[in-house]
Amino acid sequence: MNHINHIKILLMEELQINNLETDIFLALMKSEKTTSFGMQENLNLPPDQIIEIAKSLETKGMVIEINKNEFRALHPRFAIVNRYRRICEVNNIPFKKNTKIDNLGIMLENYQNQV
C-alpha cells in the first residue's frame, strides 16, 4: 500500500469521513486555496458536488470557505485535532491525547509539504 492510500484509510477510519471527503480534503491540502472548478479537473466530479462535500468538511471543522465557493484546508494538525474533538463531543467521549490522531496530523503535514 502506498503512502497516500495509507493516509486516506486513516482519515476515513479515524476521522469518520468518506472517500469523497478524503479526496477533496487532500486536494485542498495540495493548493493554498481553490474553487470547485479548480478541483474539478483532478476529481472528475461536478462543481456542485464538490461544493457540497467541501461544505460538509467545513461543518466537520477541517476546511473553511474563504470566498463564495472558494475553500482552503486548515493546517493539517489543526484540521485533524479539530475533527477528532468534534467526534469526541458527538460520542460523549473525553477529549484527550490520541497518538494515532497526532501521528496522522504529522503525516498530513509531511504530505502537504511534499506537494
Please name every model-derived segment.
Residues 1-14:
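Short, Lys/Arg-enriched N-terminal segment that forms or immediately precedes the first helix
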Residues 21-28:
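Short alpha-helical "packing" element that flanks the helix-turn-helix/winged-helix DNA-binding module
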Residues 27, 42, 97-98:
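Short acidic/histidine-centered micro-motifs embedded in hydrophobic/aromatic stretches
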Residues 32-42:
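Short acidic, hydrophobic short linear motifs in intrinsically disordered regions
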Residues 44-59:
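Short amphipathic alpha-helical interaction segments
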Residues 83-115:
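Amphipathic alpha-helical dimerization/coiled-coil segments
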